[in-house]
């Protein structure tokens, strides 16, 4: 996904981890204000960075394990327990009672296709 320093980014990372029952490591950059980079943007406060970071490590149930790291470059670390993946999937029913093989079918087309297709 696109880099985003706002709180919504943190919420999105937590949701992705929870929905996928997986660990998420989100590394976000830090950049000074546009003015300090020689770029003038109308109404941009000189003390506001272009990107303020927000790197975070999230567990499979959406819990923040490290971060978010904002306003500075740094290294986030977290001790993870891969058994958390198993525990997180106890209530993760991807093919359970609401899967309807009697009315839905998943077909995967394995033929190679171009990434972009131009039509007239």
Task: Label each PLM-derived region with a short phrase.
Residues 72-90:
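A short, polar/charged loop-to-alpha-helix boundary motif
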Residues 1-76:
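CN hydrolase (nitrilase-like) catalytic-core segments centered on the catalytic cysteine
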Residues 29, 85-120:
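Cysteine/selenocysteine-centered motifs that mediate thiol-based redox chemistry or coordinate metal-sulfur cofactors
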């Amino acid at each position: 996904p696109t880099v985003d320093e706002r709180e919504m980014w943190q919420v999105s990372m937590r949701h992705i981890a929870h929905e996928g029952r997986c660990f998420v490591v989100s590394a976000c950059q830090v950049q000074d204000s546009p003015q300090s980079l020689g770029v003038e943007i109308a109404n941009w406060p000189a003390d506001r960075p272009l990107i303020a970071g927000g790197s975070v490590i999230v567990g499979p149930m959406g819990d923040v394990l490290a971060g978010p790291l904002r306003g500075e470059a740094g290294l986030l670390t977290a001790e993870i327990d891969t058994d958390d993946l198993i525990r997180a999937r106890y209530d993760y029913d991807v093919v359970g009672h609401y899967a309807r093989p009697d009315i839905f079918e998943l077909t995967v087309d394995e033929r190679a296709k171009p990434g972009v297709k131009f039509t007239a």
